[in-house]
């Protein structure tokens, strides 16, 4: 089965995808991946969702709101960054914005005056550095090639750097069993105690939240929706009670969307 993920070849998403299949198809944005999986063009995709240093990947969260999908699995992968260039002389460092941010301390300490150039992926940054000797790239150390040599390894700000990825599928593939469940809540209203009510309904059922994040709805300033991950299966009676209460809490124009249940895999 083909897996859709962020390209070009060599991205961290690509490396995670190879754990599932050798049949990989690339897109140049997370939004394109989620759209093509949501409408059934592809049966499976892999996207980055959250990094242990820089937090959530905002494009991924926005895409999960805009397109209906199922989460089949969560994959946690270690992220090790290296600085690669054709020589030790360059005037620009490029990579995906998340990678640049994850190596902020290294860049500030060693190259405070160089230009930082965002790329669509770590792999596309590697391609730029391969073509242009004035550019260095941040990416996986195995991205070195005949033109690019490794100038420094493990340059991420934290040695425990890791990223969560979601394996996604069309919404008809949602699962009821798994270690965790994800839900998106859009109250489309704002009043004192709203967030407390949402959190209390989980606490009343003794359900542990592993992540809660508010994101702008895009409709107007101050209007938010919530991404919540929690430790329970969709088919548990306590989860069904939570969903019932959440539907009651949101206004008539709001909505609650479960993305299904899934297990967690840790890669080494």
What are these regions (language model features)?
Residues 1-268:
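Domain-level signature for soluble enzymes in the chorismate/prephenate branch of the shikimate pathway
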């Amino acid at each position: 089965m083909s897996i859709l993920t962020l390209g070009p070849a060599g991205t961290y998403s690509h490396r995670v995808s190879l754990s599932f299949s050798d049949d990989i198809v690339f897109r140049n944005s997370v939004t394109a991946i989620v759209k093509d999986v949501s409408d059934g063009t592809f049966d499976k995709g892999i996207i980055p969702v959250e990094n242990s240093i820089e937090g959530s990947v905002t494009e991924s969260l926005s895409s999960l709101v805009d397109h209906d999908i199922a989460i089949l699995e969560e994959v946690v992968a270690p992220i090790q960054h290296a600085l690669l260039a054709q020589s030790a002389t360059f005037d620009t460092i490029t990579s995906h914005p998340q990678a640049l941010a994850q190596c902020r301390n290294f860049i500030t300490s060693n190259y405070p005056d160089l230009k930082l150039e965002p790329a669509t992926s770590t792999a596309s940054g590697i391609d730029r550095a391969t073509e242009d000797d004035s550019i260095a790239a941040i990416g996986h150390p195995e991205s070195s090639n005949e033109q690019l040599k490794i100038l420094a390894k493990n340059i991420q700000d934290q040695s425990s750097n890791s990223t969560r990825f979601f394996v996604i599928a069309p919404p008809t593939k949602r699962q009821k069993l798994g270690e965790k469940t994800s839900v998106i809540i859009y109250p489309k209203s704002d009043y004192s105690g709203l967030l407390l009510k949402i959190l209390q309904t989980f606490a009343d059922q003794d359900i542990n939240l592993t992540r809660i994040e508010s994101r702008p709805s895009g409709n107007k300033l101050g209007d938010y929706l919530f991404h919540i991950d929690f430790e329970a299966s969709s088919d548990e009676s306590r989860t069904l009670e939570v969903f019932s209460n959440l539907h009651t809490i949101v206004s008539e124009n709001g909505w609650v969307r479960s993305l299904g249940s899934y297990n967690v895999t840790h890669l080494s």
